[in-house]
Amino acid sequence: MCTNTSGNPSDRYAADVVSLNRDLSFRNLVRLAKNDPAIFTHFAERGDGLVTLAVPTRHLPHRYLIGLQGFRLAQYLQLGWACSDVAYRQAIFCEPIGVTHADDEHIITMSPSGRILGYVSLATNGDGETRDLFDPERASYPVEEAHGINIFDHVAPLPGVRTHEVRELKRFVHSRTLTDRTQRLRVTLELLHGLGQAVAAATPAVRTLIGDVEEHVALRHLLMAGLEVQLVEGTAPQLTDHDLLKHAYTERASVKPFVSHLPDAGFAAQQAAMLDETLSSPDLFQAATELPAGQLSRVERERRAA
């Protein structure tokens, strides 16, 4: 059962998982990016040593994929969004590798020592071939599985767009060791910049982004990136007591599915360039404050039919 009751063996197990992943360094992944840049979608190294990169699963050495999945689990355990008793019973120290797909992009920001400071993924639905979004045989995206819906029943897709032109934003998370406000904002912007570069590099072009967000938390990141967001109201998560991530939906404020259609194929590159300029500003907070107003981001709401 997904309870996270304190003081039991699963609590101690979760602490061990967090400790294990806290000591990992991905410094050699930076070396790999410098030695073999063609397999990386994005690489940016700032003057202070902060590094952000994007790499698809198919080019990520297995040991680093395990490490990334471990980072994801460790942060969610600390936030109380992963079920420690499920992790304990299944004896897992990272999120299951099987939930990733070959074309998923992993965007990572690291400290000069190689410690992960922030992470977000750009996920496919895992279909080997492109399908119509209303094809009953197509694989569901994770947000659709969690909420028990076809998200495009609630927000109409762009004409002609198929599964290979849709990506899901997942696991936008900062390291729990990151407490400085300026550094946290910096990492957020670096991840959004890397995400924009990954979207811009995708083939075929990404036309729609989906996922789910807390309205007063991650939604702000989407608006900061200049996205126009349509939220789906009135869904109910379908996760069971045996699901590792049930608490991601029960221990947070309402988590709502969203759809964001990109206006054209060049939009992501344009927004990435704007974020890169923001990151070069001497006053990061002021520059970030000016982003949403300048980009006319907005939120629309779609009520799920009963």
Predicted features, each with a name:
Residues 132-252:
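Acyl-donor binding region in acyl/amide transferases
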Residues 2-7, 23-32, 38-93, 106-116, ...:
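Short amphipathic alpha-helix that is part of the acyltransferase structural core
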